[in-house]
Regions:
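Short hydrophobic/aromatic segments of transmembrane alpha-helices and their interfaces
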Residues: 5-6, 26, 166-167
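Short, well-ordered surface patches within globular domains
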Residues: 33-147, 190
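Bacterial N-terminal signal peptides that target proteins for export
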Residues: 1-9
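A well-ordered secondary-structure block
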Residues: 110-217
């Protein structure tokens, strides 16, 4: 265990071939992960779309969102306006970073990491709390190590109030109001190869989603 991170998204035919060749088997692997809900599976599929071709994802999925801003207000279709911290600035920055980012290894699902993520979801469903620290002082590392041994690098991403897999991933990528942009950096980090995901209702923010990411993981 060498590093810990605990922060609180040439030719077109050639690119499509690479995505289909590498991502499709991964999608099949995700679909076989019976411990994940349909929502959680779609979050992981969306994350791997980002990693398979960050530049293409930014062009097709993020650039259109620029039209949804009215000053600092952001309006998801069919939802009430959201007042952002930075307006378009964080989104412009995200697009610029992703257009320079080379494709990354796809993330494989981990049952042990998903169990660790679910510990925090279940607790915060009861308490209404937010953040990375549990009621009895637990943190991402202690929760993950209940279920096995992680390798290389470990990080936890959490979102609140996002009721679709697409919104979960996009909000983490944009990372509005987070100066470190660690949520985005985690998604675009080549060191991460496996992930656990847990999502559920939250008493104050309607929906929450927790991701535990590691370089590798061996369940107990």
């Amino acid at each position: 265990m060498s590093q810990r991170i605990f922060p609180i998204f040439f030719l077109i035919l050639f690119s499509l071939f690479i995505f289909n060749a590498k991502a499709q088997p991964n999608i099949q692997l995700i679909q076989r992960a019976t411990y994940l809900t349909a929502f959680e599976k779609q979050v992981l599929i969306e994350l791997n779309k980002v990693r398979a071709n960050p530049a293409q994802y930014a062009e097709e999925n993020l650039e259109p969102l620029l039209k949804a801003f009215d000053g600092r207000l952001f309006i998801w279709p069919g939802t009430i306006p959201i007042k952002t911290h930075e307006g378009k600035k964080a989104l412009f920055e995200c697009i610029r970073v992703m257009k320079k980012q080379k494709p990354l290894p796809l993330l494989s699902p981990s049952e042990g990491l998903s169990k660790a993520a679910n510990v925090l979801v279940k607790e915060q469903q009861k308490t209404g709390a937010i953040g990375h620290t549990g009621r009895r002082g637990s943190n991402p590392q202690t929760r993950v190590e209940q279920f096995g041994d992680w390798k290389g690098k470990l990080a936890e991403n959490i979102t609140y109030g996002n009721n679709s897999p697409f919104r979960v991933v996009v909000n983490l990528l944009i990372d509005d109001g987070v100066p470190s942009r660690n949520h985005r950096k985690n998604i675009l980090d080549t060191a991460f190869r496996t992930i656990g995901i847990a999502a559920g209702d939250h008493p104050k923010y309607t929906k929450m989603c927790v991701m535990e990411m590691a370089g590798g993981f061996q369940s107990k």
